[in-house]
Amino acid sequence: PNQEEKSIVKVRPVRVSTDRAVLPTLPETALVEYDKGFPKEKPVTWEPVSADQVGRYHTFTVKGHIEGIDQKAEAKVTVEGIIAVEEVSVTTPVGERPALPESVRAYHSNGKSFAAKVVWDQVNPQQFAQEGEFVLAGKVEGTDLPTRLHVRVSQDTVQGANVAEQWTGSVLPLAFASDSNDADPVAKVNDKVISFTDAPANRWTNWGRNNAEDSVGILFGDSGILTKRAVDNLHVGFHEDHGVGAPSEYVIEYYSGSEIPAVPSNPNRVKEEADHPFNNPANWKEVSHLTVEEPVTAGKMNHFAFDKVDTYAVRIRMKTPEDKRGSSISEMQIFAKKVAAEAKSQLTIRVNNEVLPGVNPSVTDYYIDARGPQVDASASQHGLATVVPSVHEGEPIRVIHKAEDGTILQEYRLHLTSDAEQLKQLAPVAVEAGSRFVKVGQNLVLPSTVGVYFKGATGYERKELTVNWEAVPADALSHEGSFTLEGKVIGYDLTAQLTVRVS
């Protein structure tokens, strides 16, 4: 029989992505559509792709020949990939292993950014054994793209989070007890509710269990994952009524066993799980150099301090108070120590190794010579800067400035131009003087910006620029009078003045 004539409607184009400097893998076939029947796969012979074509981020077309068909196959090849990876910073107390971020911000050639997982090098304990700074290298997972973690180790600490409290959605951190009264479960001691009365009756007790001593502790977890904690404090709120009270004697201990402890099957009565490592006295050591606000009493939070230990668990082992039938705890707290990260920083941008003048947080757009500039940036006070290059015509170079605590302070855009007028640096000629009136004893709120006048080709231009003020004298607001503060206009050799009147 005669076969029905078919005409080619089109050859479906294909889209392929590749990274810079990587030749694309083009499909062996293309789909040919006819005016009748189904499309068919046909072998394609593609034009060669050169190294120059994949040497920059862009999209180009590759033609292909299909045997017996006049129409050409087309492949749209997009060269894309990660063009910048941020560096990050953390702080840690002396002797505590720093927490390594799981991910960093990566910037893609398509203009988007995303959180990329990182594989970090190993941390040497000597690196955080004393005050100082060190840098840890890392790579974006599955790539050779490098990043760095800047770690500052310090003895200057402040109180951090309560690492004993329950974490929503997980059993860890876990409160556990050797024994408990069924009506007063141990989960009450880390539920963030402190009550020394029956309204509410929120406590653990071992009332009526007739034990000479019992223990209550915390098994640590970080975001629900079993982990060690560096611990040097314990805060215990004992409760008292006619049947229970604060212990007559106590010992604070930390878990020192070699076996990683599992979550007890019954946290209220760990002693019933005979083979659990918590039941082996050899796995516990008494803390050293214990200090406490005396006397230890019920009805308040009692604060214990001791030498720092690195452990999975801490407990208080208690003897039942005389004339009572048990001990009682409303809440247990253990606070991490942390090094306060810097929240401020100043940025320096360099173009071809020359400092870009006039960089101020109140101005985000700058113009630089378009002829292949090399841009880098640095930040003061342990801040960091990420330079995201321009990969498409008309796109600016971006500089993201972050403080040590991770706050993005500003994003600057460096526009590439050959326009002499745009490249011209205006000269500042004057700073507006400011004034404030406050009442005696009131707080003084300082302006974050000042007006600065620049001389232009056709007149004067006024800009609001960020200023750093000197500290207010300690007693200046405690009595009537006036004083003058000076401030530094960021990015310029300019001094601002603010007159303050106190009445």
In which residue ranges do the predicted regions lie?
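Predominantly extracellular/luminal regions of secreted and cell-surface proteins
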Residues: 157-196, 340-351
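Beta-rich interaction/scaffold domains
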Residues: 2-161, 338-376, 380-503
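Ordered hydrophobic segments in well-structured contexts
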Residues: 76, 80, 135-137, 148-150, ...
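Aromatic, loop-rich ligand-recognition surfaces of beta-strand-rich domains
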Residues: 198-270, 298-341
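Non-catalytic extracellular/lumenal accessory regions of secreted precursors
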Residues: 191-205, 352-360
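Extracellular carbohydrate recognition and processing domains
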Residues: 269-307
